């Protein structure tokens, strides 16, 4: 005698929140039928700190230290968008040397962000070795940051009109040495990971997003380019001095987790190419504009002496934001990072709206994990690459 039993009981499981050094304070309420995912509901807001409201009660200079807490693995980009917004609003020109320094720092930060995505992503799939390899190269990048900015993380290096300090003597030679060394590391990653049959089984065809879906969901960054859309703001809407360098947009057409991995690995190669060109072509001249203009216009000649400029230097200048509005954006490692700024003839912004790429990209997660296995959730979530600091703001 055989009995056909049908189990209709569903299981609801909480995944997260985790420590910020791991997957962050993201909570997923997952409905399971055995190991099959029936539904997934992301719960956000555990890391909300009111960053937009804080901006409306601070001048841009006062607000700069806050922004490095959005995406704390790619802080140069949050600083860049924070100074770009008032620069565009008030038509402030920055020296060419400062623009090149910004590009170098941004691309180093992009590599560091992709490295710290790759290591934990592979660890989620069960491969621990790459996790230790990526920290080897990441430490070298942080050594370069420390030499130029004084900080390994949370650099507070960008300023309205330029950067806080020029590159120290010998820094560019060390940067070029790192570029040569890192290219060998990328080859090592690809030999270790890309053709690994176990890795391919876990990522190939998992988390598929078509090009049309990616556009309709408003995805950006590697999430968009891995679905066949060649959209990179450094090419489409150039900022800083990106239009002066020779490099290619990295994209794939498959739209799965493997394609997103390949896009990010390819971007690290292109970032090295941009850094090498910027270091070789960097012009002379000032690294900051507003301070130089202030000293030039100073009526008191004592303000130009050594003691004032180097020993008793006053804080960076503030200025009123005129009654205008604009939207500025940069191509961050995770996608389009934008700021909608509204000025009101005041030192403080009237409105400071942040467009974080991680928040937009995360919205498609429930659709991607439905009808997949429980183990695929970490693969898909890892391939999106989110930092909850910028998601919750």
Swiss-Prot record:
Q: Which GO BP terms, alphabetically?
A: photosynthesis, light reaction
Q: Which Gene3D superfamilies match?
A: Cytochrome-c3 Hydrogenase, chain B
What is the superkingdom listed in this entry's lineage?
A: Eukaryota
**GO CC terms of this entry:** chloroplast thylakoid membrane
Q: Which InterPro entries match?
A: NADH_Q_OxRdtase_suD, NADH_UbQ_OxRdtase_49kDa_CS, NDH1_su_D/H, NiFe-Hase_large
Q: Which UniProt keywords apply?
A: Chloroplast, Membrane, NAD, NADP, Plastid, Plastoquinone, Quinone, Thylakoid, Translocase, Transport
User: Could you tell me the EC number(s) of this protein?
Assistant: 7.1.1.-
This entry's Gene Ontology molecular function terms read: NAD binding; oxidoreductase activity, acting on NAD(P)H, quinone or similar compound as acceptor; quinone binding
Major site of localization recorded for this protein = plastid
Which residue ranges does UniProt annotate as crossing the membrane? none
> Which membrane topology describes this protein?
Peripheral membrane protein
Q: Which Pfam families does its entry note?
A: Complex1_49kDa
Q: Which reaction does it catalyse?
A: a plastoquinone + NADH + (n+1) H(+)(in) = a plastoquinol + NAD(+) + n H(+)(out); a plastoquinone + NADPH + (n+1) H(+)(in) = a plastoquinol + NADP(+) + n H(+)(out)
Q: Where in the cell is it found?
A: Plastid, Chloroplast thylakoid membrane
SUPFAM superfamilies, per this entry? HydB/Nqo4-like (SSF56762)
Q: What class of enzyme is it?
A: translocase
Q: Belongs to which family?
A: Belongs to the complex I 49 kDa subunit family.
Primary role: NDH shuttles electrons from NAD(P)H:plastoquinone, via FMN and iron-sulfur (Fe-S) centers, to quinones in the photosynthetic chain and possibly in a chloroplast respiratory chain. The immediate electron acceptor for the enzyme in this species is believed to be plastoquinone. Couples the redox reaction to proton translocation, and thus conserves the redox energy in a proton gradient.
Q: How does it assemble?
A: NDH is composed of at least 16 different subunits, 5 of which are encoded in the nucleus.
Indicate what this protein is called per its UniProt record: NAD(P)H-quinone oxidoreductase subunit H, chloroplastic
């Amino acid at each position: 005698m055989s009995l056909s039993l049908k189990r209709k009981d569903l299981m609801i499981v909480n995944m997260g929140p985790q420590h910020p050094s791991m997957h962050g304070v993201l909570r997923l309420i997952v409905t399971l039928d055995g190991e099959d995912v029936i539904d997934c509901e992301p719960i956000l807001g555990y890391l909300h700190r009111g960053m937009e409201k804080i901006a409306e009660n601070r001048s841009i200079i006062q607000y700069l230290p806050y922004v490095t807490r959005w995406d704390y693995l790619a802080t140069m980009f949050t600083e860049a968008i924070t100074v770009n917004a008032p620069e565009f609003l008030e038509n402030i020109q920055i020296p060419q040397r400062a623009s090149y320094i910004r590009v170098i720092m941004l691309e180093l930060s992009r590599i560091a962000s992709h490295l710290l995505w790759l290591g934990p992503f592979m660890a989620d799939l069960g491969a621990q070795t790459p996790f230790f390899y990526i920290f080897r190269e990441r430490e070298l990048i942080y050594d370069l940051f420390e030499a130029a900015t004084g900080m390994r993380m949370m650099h507070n290096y960008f300023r309205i009109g330029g950067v806080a300090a020029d590159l120290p003597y010998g820094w560019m030679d060390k940067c070029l040495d790192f570029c040569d060394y890192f290219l060998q590391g990328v080859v090592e990653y690809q030999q270790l990971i890309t053709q690994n049959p176990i890795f391919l089984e876990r990522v190939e065809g998992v988390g598929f997003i078509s090009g049309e879906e990616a556009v309709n969901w408003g995805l950006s960054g590697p999430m968009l380019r891995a679905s066949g859309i060649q959209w990179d703001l450094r090419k489409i809407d150039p900022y800083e001095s990106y239009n002066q360098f020779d490099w290619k947009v990295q994209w794939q057409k498959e739209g799965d987790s493997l394609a997103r991995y390949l896009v990010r690995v390819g971007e690290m190669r292109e970032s090295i190419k941009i850094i090498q060109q910027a270091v070789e072509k960097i012009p002379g001249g000032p690294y900051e504009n507003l301070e130089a203009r202030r000293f030039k216009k100073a009526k008191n000649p004592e303000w130009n002496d050594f003691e004032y400029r180097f020993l008793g230097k006053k804080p960076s200048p503030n200025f009123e934001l005129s009654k205008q509005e604009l939207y500025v954006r940069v191509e961050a490692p995770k996608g389009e990072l934008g700021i909608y700024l509204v000025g009101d003839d005041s030192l403080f912004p009237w409105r400071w709206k942040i467009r974080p790429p991680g928040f937009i990209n995360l919205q498609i997660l429930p659709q991607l994990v439905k009808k997949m296995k429980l183990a695929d959730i970490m693969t898909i979530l890892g391939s999106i690459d989110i930092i909850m600091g910028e998601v919750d703001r």
